[in-house]
Design a protein with these regions (language model features):
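Single transmembrane alpha-helix segments in multi-pass membrane proteins
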Residues: 20-83, 107-117, 132, 259, ...
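Inter-helical junctions in multi-pass inner-membrane proteins, predominant
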Residues: 25-37, 132-136, 214-228, 238-243, ...
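Loop-to-transmembrane alpha-helix initiation sites
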Residues: 41, 116, 143-146, 161-170, ...
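Alpha-helical transmembrane segments within multi-pass membrane transporters and channels
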Residues: 84-125, 331, 336
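Membrane-helix/interface signature in polytopic inner-membrane proteins
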Residues: 181-197, 236-275
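Cytosolic-side transmembrane-helix boundaries in multi-pass membrane proteins
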Residues: 1-20, 24, 139, 171-204, ...
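Transmembrane alpha-helical segments in multi-pass inner-membrane proteins
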Residues: 102, 275-286, 292-358
Length: 374
């Protein structure tokens, strides 16, 4: 069987199997409350994984993102809670810090020809130390008392029911338009066009799934705003990788960096740009993860780099670069989130969680090596 077909079948089946197992062990797993919680967690892992996807496409890796999530979230929390900065300004400062730090790392990698593994491993330790210094090894809330601000609302705000349904309808309409344009483009280039019935059936499936998901979320509090952050990030990364020269350069560099350089691609600038975008993903994830915790603590971001890498590789992104899709990353992140959420719901011991995460990461790398040969 073709390896692409095998992977495409394996991922949905793995997700169904994981969800089925946890639902059998604990029916509340598929309840509105837990699914909403799962989606918030998925938004955090998925956003970080999308940033990691851009790095892995070029054949690089970033081991510093977990510590960076804690550091950037901590910077914003300190500015809000200890220095009375308005939340939007504090979040902007955190984003600026992330852009500076990740552009510096990217610059070091390309200017000094140091492997990204080494630079980002150092970043992991440096950022962790800076994080603990920034929060002074204490707990820093993201807001004062019971007051709400933009920071705290990142994972606690839910769309009103009517807005969620309207948004689902809008997304369904956009999908229909994109499908129509894709068919028109294939017809214009005299390529094979799938039957109308298949296209309409596929669109109806997505539309029903979208409305069903919103109805399910409305059974608790509504669609979490963090899901919109993930959706916007995914849409941006999809457009970047599929419809811009920068995205094509990422694939080319990962496929063969020497050939990319000889063909005139500005390899150094593209790599620095990829790391800067990784910094944006780290900042967004840091804000959401810290808000989800309610405060910046020394454990925020722990091991998230491994979850992001595993999500990418499970979804078909090659560690050697040059191969991967946004949809695969999203599916890989969903599998990782379902696994972690289910273990938490079943009150699995922390040591078993570590073993499971390590096993999943090892399996993901094995899949990359074995299936990548096909």
């Amino acid at each position: 069987m073709n390896t692409r077909v095998l992977r495409n079948l394996a991922l949905p089946l793995a997700l169904v199997a994981i969800c089925g197992f946890f639902a059998f062990k604990e029916p509340a797993f598929l309840g509105p409350r837990n699914l909403t919680q799962l989606v918030v967690e998925f938004s955090m892992i998925g956003t970080l994984a999308l940033g990691m996807f851009l790095i892995l496409l070029t054949g690089q890796i970033d081991l510093s993102v977990g510590s960076g999530v804690g550091l950037i979230g901590g910077i914003a929390a300190v500015l809000v809670f200890q220095h009375d900065w308005p939340a939007p300004l504090a979040l902007g400062a955190g984003l600026a810090a992330a852009l500076v730090l990740w552009s510096l790392m990217g610059g070091l990698i390309v200017s000094q020809r140091i492997p990204s593994f080494i630079i980002t491993l150092g970043g992991l330790l440096v950022f962790k130390g800076l994080f603990w210094l920034v929060i002074d090894n204490s707990t820093i809330p993201v807001s004062r008392g019971d007051e709400e601000n933009l920071y705290s609302l990142l994972t606690t705000y839910y769309l009103p029911s009517s807005v969620g349904l309207a948004l689902a309808g809008l997304v369904a309409a956009v999908l229909a338009l994109l499908s129509f344009r894709a068919r028109a483009a294939r017809r214009a280039h005299r390529l094979g066009v799938p039957p109308v019935a298949r296209a309409v059936g596929g669109w109806l499936g997505w539309a029903v799934a979208l409305v069903g998901a919103v109805v399910l979320f409305n059974g608790f509090r509504g669609v979490p705003v963090s899901l919109l952050v993930l959706a916007a990030t995914a849409a941006g990364v999809f457009f970047l990788t599929r419809h811009t020269p920068f995205g094509r350069y990422l694939y080319a560099i990962g496929g063969n960096q020497e050939a990319a350089l000889l063909s005139g691609i500005p390899v150094n600038r593209v790599l620095i740009g990829a790391f800067m975008l990784m910094g944006v993903a780290v900042a967004l994830t840091g804000f959401m993860t810290t808000a989800f915790s309610g405060a910046s603590t020394t454990t925020v971001g722990d091991l998230m780099e491994l979850d992001a890498i595993a999500a990418c590789v499970i979804g078909g992104t090659a560690l050697r670069g040059g191969r991967g899709t946004v949809s695969g990353v999203i599916l890989g992140a969903l599998i990782m989130t379902a696994l972690l959420n289910g273990m938490t719901l079943l009150a699995v011991a922390p040591e078993i969680k570590f073993i499971a995460r390590g096993a999943v990461l090892a399996l993901a790398v094995w899949m990359d090596v074995r299936l990548g040969r096909g």
